[in-house]
Amino acid sequence: MTHLAVIDPLVRLFALLASDGPTLTEDAVQRLVEAAKEGDSSAARELYDAYVARVLRAVRPLCRSEAEAEDVAQETFVTVLTKLHTYQHRPGARFIAWVLTIARNTAHRSARHRRVVPVDTDTLHLPDRDDGADPTAAALDHVREKAALLQALSELPERDRTVVSLRWGGGLKAREVARATGLKPDLVRKICQRRRPQLLARIEELLQP
């Protein structure tokens, strides 16, 4: 009997913010990192392609628009390449955690220029779709879900929004989120446990006709 993996609903919703790039093993990542350190531009590009979606998913809730999130992602990778010579792999530590720490810091620098995170919520008021054979129905649902996710996240305190975004948008483990944010791992776990059901309930509420 085939067992299908159950996708966490928050992971599925965050996936709407950016499409995944190629999947790399950690060994492959380390080979690319070492090659990029030596100036191999194709290795640097492979790292970018593999991780840009996760960076975008992690920083989009921290930014006021998709354009700002894209700028933050680009600046993140400029910093990654500039500081790559300082990166030292440690057993059990993942390269993506280092990248997303830089992304989080970059997003917070950008946010210092404005203290409110407005979210375009027009898409939340789209007309109800017909359940007929409209080929755009699924796309419309995705637009509404994406907008609902961003609205729900924007209502969280900055600390909790950052933790949730790194955890489910960036795919980091609790200890990696703790290292990226300077919070204790137990506090990160408590934030995730508390906010996850709240977010899902709020998103469901926003999607009600």
Language-model segments: residues:
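Structural recognition of an alpha-helix C-terminal capping motif at a helix-to-coil junction
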Residues: 71-78, 82, 93-105, 190
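Conserved RNAP core-binding helix
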Residues: 28-30, 45-48, 56, 66-83
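Conserved catalytic/ATP-binding subdomain
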Residues: 67, 93-97, 143, 147
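Hydrophobic recognition helices of helix-based DNA-binding modules
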Residues: 55, 59, 80, 84, ...
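Sigma70-family region 2
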Residues: 37-38, 61-65, 77-92, 113-115
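Intrinsic, short, N-terminal disordered tails of RNA polymerase sigma-factor systems
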Residues: 1-38, 42, 46-49, 111-115, ...
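Arg/Lys-rich amphipathic alpha helix in sigma70-family domain 2
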Residues: 82-90, 100-121, 142
